[in-house]
Amino acid sequence: MPSSLAILVSKCTIFPDQKSHVETLKLSVSDIPMLSCQYIQKGVLLTAPPFSFQDLVVFLQQSLSTTLSCFPPLAGRLITDPDGHVHIDCNGAGIDFLVVKSPTLSVNDILCPGDVPGCVKEFFTFDKTLSYSGHFKPLAAVQVTELADGVFIGCSVNHAVTDGTSFWHFFNTFAEITRGASKISKNPDFCRQTVFNSQAVLKFPTGGPTVTFSGDEPLRERIFHFSREAILKLKYRANYGCLLTKQTNSEIVGKLSNDNWKSVNSNTEISSFQSLCAQLWRSVTRARKLEPTKTTTFRMAVNCRHRLDPKLNPYYFGNAIQSIPNIAPASELLANDLSWGANLLHKSVMAHDNETVLGGVEDWERQPRLFPLGNADGASITMGSSPRFPMYNNDLGWGKPLAVRSGRANKFDGKISAFPGREEDGSVDLEVVLAPETMAGLENDAEIMQYVSQVELVN
């Protein structure tokens, strides 16, 4: 792979093209714990547009200005009132917009098999920036990088301001306006009269919180692609593993050919994604060579918008997530079949209803605290993002993205991010970050690698 030569061409501030109708938004019980998390960094790889890069930059700047008028909190700054409550001041201070050129990099350099190339981290700004820094830094930034034969658009957003659902809502709207839409199709909901609104105060030391993981340990990062067929096989194993030896692979896929992995038909059925997560939990635990009695943890984030009664607006803007830790001794997880671990995950997700969400809010109010991101005991996995997110809806006018990639933010041994496959047929890409020796073990784990397939390069 050629060396990455990133040249900063320009940097400016993009302001909303209209004055905000929203003045301030108070951070919620779900927002505040994220102040110690780094900015979300996600972006899309695109083919070169059918017009000049200079024209693209102008189009993006104009559409971003319009988009910010639809999402005024992102153009603001954080403020803390005398009582210690943190708010978003929707003051229209603007966001950063960077133009970068990397003429030696090609699209296939980014899509190459094996580890994610380090140059991808250069496609984002606000590297290692904690969300608390939104008190004095922009709450978002967009970086446009011109490659030899393509474009990468990287977006960095304060994690105390958005979760993944709101992040991709913003990105999709940005793409929609860039395509020429005169009116956006999905308006964000800035209502703060929800169960997450609280009078509890989390006190911060002078200068704000520190990151909850070291970030200095050696890591490897790789994208593992799971086709729709592989996902269906995993789901079948998790639900009907005892019957698996009696049927051929083609029969299994045929049996589940009408499966929609996004919608589980029964509360008793383990979903496709839960099946995939359970397989990853098993294989990473085996690759870590833990003591049999060591307690392993698989932490999942759940979207609470539809779990509340009454439900939140699907386009509620902000964080509306809670974390579910699932624990199991290493020996039990590995001694049992896939369905055992998958059933643990399934039961915890199904149990996370309105009452559980409210209980989580009350628990936080009794003991306000930051989100414990990291892997302190060496036996944890944290699953972030979601293959449900509409990442490939970011067509800016000349075709959907070739791939989705993320920056350096919030990565540590055991951090996994789930993306939809580009096929958008139920396939999944897992962005896996592990210690080098664990990654080597995972790559040699036949149980999971039988389901992994290569993504073809661009011709």
Where are these regions (language model features)?
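Short, surface-exposed beta-strand/loop micro-motifs that present aromatic residues
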Residues: P33, L139-T145, D413-G421
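Soluble acyl-CoA-dependent acyltransferase catalytic core bearing the H(X)4D motif
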Residues: P2-T24, S36-M391
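Low-complexity, glycine/alanine/valine/leucine- and proline-rich hydrophobic stretches
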Residues: A376-V458
